[in-house]
Amino acid sequence: MRFLLGTNTVIGLLGGNAGVLAGVRRYVPQDFGIPAIAAHELFYGAYRSARRAQNLALLDGLPLAVLEFDKEDARQAGEIRAALAAAGMPIGPYDVLIAGQARARGLVLVTHNVGEFARVSGLQVEDWQS
C-alpha cells in the first residue's frame, strides 16, 4: 500500500473526477487504502443522502481496503494535535485522525484538502483532483 485516499478523493473517484481517475489508473488497487475515519464520513453522507441505496451500493462495491485505526495511528494523531494546538493552527478532529494514520504508516495522503493537511509536519500530501 502506498496511498491513503481521503474522503473528498473517494467522493471524486466515485463521481468520476478526471484527475482522481487518472491518478488511480497509474497504480493497482492494492496501492490504495481508505482510513476507517473516512469510511465513516462516507457512510454518514450516504445515509443522509436522497439516494441512500445507490450511494451505499457504491461504497460497498469499492475494491479498496479500509484501514482500521490502531494504537500507533492514535499516538501519531495525538502528537499532531498537540503540536498544531501549540502552534495555534489546529485542524478538524477527523482530519487529525486521518493525518495520524497516514503519517504512522508512511503513506501518501491523497486529498483535495491540502490547506488543512499541509500544516502537519512529516505528512506527505498529494492532490489529484482537477
Please describe what each predicted stretch is:
Residues 23, 58, 65, 76, ...:
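Residue-level recognition of specific faces of alpha-helices
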Residues 35, 39, 52, 56-59, ...:
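A general structural signal for well-ordered alpha-helical segments in protein cores
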